[in-house]
Amino acid sequence: MKPSERRKARRLAVQAIYSWQLSGNNIADVEHEFLTEQKIDGIDVAYFRELLSGTATKQAQIDEQIIPHIERPYNEVSPIEKAVLRLATYELTFRKDVPYKVAINEAIELAKAFGAEDGHKFVNGILDKIVGRK
């Protein structure tokens, strides 16, 4: 599998996580919606499914790792930055085959693509703290 297939899977997964956070819909319904309504050519669909379901089912564990490093109330973090942080923290914690530098870099790129102007700096800072680099 090409790395770009995983990159595309992450990109779609962060959008699905964002949608799930805002809608409160069942994660299986969100997955079905994204796989039927989005262009999925060249995407590692199995990885997309794992990222989405893993992030949803392990949300409490993931948030426990994120929250101590945020200096404002968690509910004030933008939904897209929260989606990126959750996805990256899932990879950092549960996908030991993904080097932490790859997970962080991919998260920064997602935050640049979807987040606020300096959102990528916020995401980078939090993820660096999670992996113990700061």
UniProtKB/Swiss-Prot annotation:
It holds the Pfam family NusB. One of its GO terms (molecular function) is RNA binding. Keywords: RNA-binding, Transcription, Transcription antitermination, Transcription regulation. One of its GO terms (cellular component) is cytosol. GO terms for biological process: DNA-templated transcription termination; transcription antitermination. InterPro entries: NusB-like_sf (IPR035926), NusB_fam (IPR011605), NusB_RsmB_TIM44 (IPR006027). The keyword Transcription regulation applies. Transmembrane segments: none annotated. HAMAP family: NusB. PANTHER family: ANTITERMINATION NUSB DOMAIN-CONTAINING PROTEIN (PTHR11078:SF3), N UTILIZATION SUBSTANCE PROTEIN B-RELATED (PTHR11078). Involved in transcription antitermination. Required for transcription of ribosomal RNA (rRNA) genes. Binds specifically to the boxA antiterminator sequence of the ribosomal RNA (rrn) operons. Belongs to the NusB family. This is Transcription antitermination protein NusB. It comes from Shewanella sediminis (strain HAW-EB3). The lineage of its organism: Bacteria, Pseudomonadati, Pseudomonadota, Gammaproteobacteria, Alteromonadales.
